[in-house]
Amino acid sequence: MAVGKNKRLTKGGKKGAKKKVVDPFSKKDWYDVKAPAMFNIRNIGKTLVTRTQGTKIASDGLKGRVFEVSLADLQNDEVAFRKFKLITEDVQGKNCLINFHGMDLTRDKMCSMVKKWQTMIEAHIDVKTTDGYLLRLFCVGFTKKRTNQIRKTSYAQHQQVRQIRKKMVEIMTREVQTNDLKEVVNKLIPDSIGKDIEKACQSIYPLHDVYVRKVKMLKKPKFELGKLMELHGEGGGSGKPSGDETGAKVERADGYEPPVQESV
């Protein structure tokens, strides 16, 4: 064996010596997540992000984060089968300002509606709102027994299914095309679109459990801070406020300037 120094020993410390454990949470900050004014509950929770270090800015890590919240939590309600997706668009101080990003029905609600002896009718359509958001809406409805019907089954004919699907597409297009995103969300909260479809299709074949089951955000217009501030600032949500955080105005940034109006 060659005589020489043992390199492992001269490097210092034993092999496999424990490193100093640093708590990862000591480098992180909590931010409040603020929902738009159309919802009753404004403060929906908190989110973690690593503090600003060098070129890595904390607010950049928050922008684009998507939160999925039950409508019952947003409206302080009992009915909880709708889930809203909300995306962080801007950070003001310790507040994440979020906007609508999509909607879905819960899995258990969808499964509870699908049954034997009835026809399931589905439709989908891509529609653009007046303020430039491109949405894909999915609708679902089920046939039901007519009054005094003895027969067990209530199947619609293929021609009737096509007529109902056409009506679904017409109503969804009309309701979205003529409104901006805020008004569309206000219609999705109580699902007035589904009720309109159910009413319009009674003459073709009686329906029940008609819902806009899913909304996808396909395209967004260029981000404008003024429009986001309008969603969060002026005007509370529909219904009575509940809690201190309800309908509270979000502080505006120091450098914020209102958008220039084309006509007075």
UniProtKB/Swiss-Prot annotation:
It comes from the Eukaryota. One of its GO terms (cellular component) is small-subunit processome. Residues 242-255 have a biased composition (Basic and acidic residues). The keyword S-adenosyl-L-methionine does not apply. One of its GO terms (biological process) is ribosomal small subunit biogenesis. It is found in: Cytoplasm; Nucleus; Nucleus, Nucleolus. InterPro entries: Ribosomal_eS1 (IPR001593), Ribosomal_eS1_CS (IPR018281), Ribosomal_eS1_euk (IPR027500). It holds the Pfam family Ribosomal_S3Ae. GO terms for molecular function: structural constituent of ribosome. Keywords: Cytoplasm, Nucleus, Ribonucleoprotein, Ribosomal protein. Residues 232-264 are annotated as: Disordered. Component of the small ribosomal subunit. Mature ribosomes consist of a small (40S) and a large (60S) subunit. The 40S subunit contains about 33 different proteins and 1 molecule of RNA (18S). The 60S subunit contains about 49 different proteins and 3 molecules of RNA (28S, 5.8S and 5S). Part of the small subunit (SSU) processome, composed of more than 70 proteins and the RNA chaperone small nucleolar RNA (snoRNA) U3. Belongs to the eukaryotic ribosomal protein eS1 family. Component of the small ribosomal subunit. The ribosome is a large ribonucleoprotein complex responsible for the synthesis of proteins in the cell. Part of the small subunit (SSU) processome, first precursor of the small eukaryotic ribosomal subunit. During the assembly of the SSU processome in the nucleolus, many ribosome biogenesis factors, an RNA chaperone and ribosomal proteins associate with the nascent pre-rRNA and work in concert to generate RNA folding, modifications, rearrangements and cleavage as well as targeted degradation of pre-ribosomal RNA by the RNA exosome. This is Small ribosomal subunit protein eS1. The gene is RPS3A.
